[in-house]
Amino acid sequence: MNKQIHFTVIIPCFNAEATVQAAIDSVISQTYSHKDLIIVDGKSTDGTLAILKANEANISLIISEKDKGVYDAINKGIKAAEGNIIYVLGADDKLASDEILEHVALHFTPEISLVFGHIRNVHIQNKAVPEVHSSSFSNLLYLKNTLHQQGCFYRTSLFEKELFNPEYKIFGDYDLHLKWFIGKINTYKLDQTISICEAAGLSKQVKWDLYKEEIRMKKARLSTLLFLLNCVWVPLKFIRKKIFA
C-alpha cells in the first residue's frame, strides 16, 4: 500500500435518493484505507439528505447548499479536500470493484499527475454510446473528450491555479483535460474498468446548445487552426448523433 497517496472522493448530487447509497457503498467498501469521502449536495428536496445522514459515520464532510451546477459542486469538494488525489464519482455511478483505489495508488509515482482508466456504461438507450468507454490521453483530445471523469484520478495540485469552470454544463472536465494535455502533464493509463456509469446523463443528450458549449470551450483553449478545424468537426458530430440517435 502506498501510504503517501490519500484519496479524497467527491460525490456531487442532487435528488439522488435512488442511487446515491450504491455510490457511497462502492467507496466505503474499498480495501485501500487512506481515503475520505466528501458529498456535495445541491439542496436536494427528496430523500437524499436522509440517506446522507444515515451514512454520516463514513462521510468526512457533507455540504448541502444550492450551487451553480455540477462543476460548482465539484469545486466546493476540491477546496475542502484533504487528500493529495482527487476522484469524482457521480451519484448514479459506482466504482467497479473494491480494489480500485488500491490499484490506482500503486501507479501514482511522484512524477505522475493523472491516472486514468476505462468506464463501463449501463442502461444504454442511445446506440451511439459504447458499453465500454476506452480512455486515452492523446491528440484525439483535440477533437473529443477521450477521458471520462469517472475514470480519472487527479493530483490535487493540478487544481491549485485553476478549478473547473462552473459556467460549463458538461465540458468543464474536457476543458481542463485539454489544458493539461497541451501542458504535457505526466499520466499513467491503467488498463482496467474504473467505474460503472449511468449512460443516460446530460452529456449524452443530443442538443445543439451543448455542442455550442464545446465550441466555446475550444475557442478559449486551442490555437486558431485547431479551433477552425473544430468549427467543422463539432457540427458534423452533432449531425451524426442526430441521425443515429
Give a label for each model feature.
Residues 130-213, 217:
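Conserved nucleotide-sugar donor-binding catalytic segment
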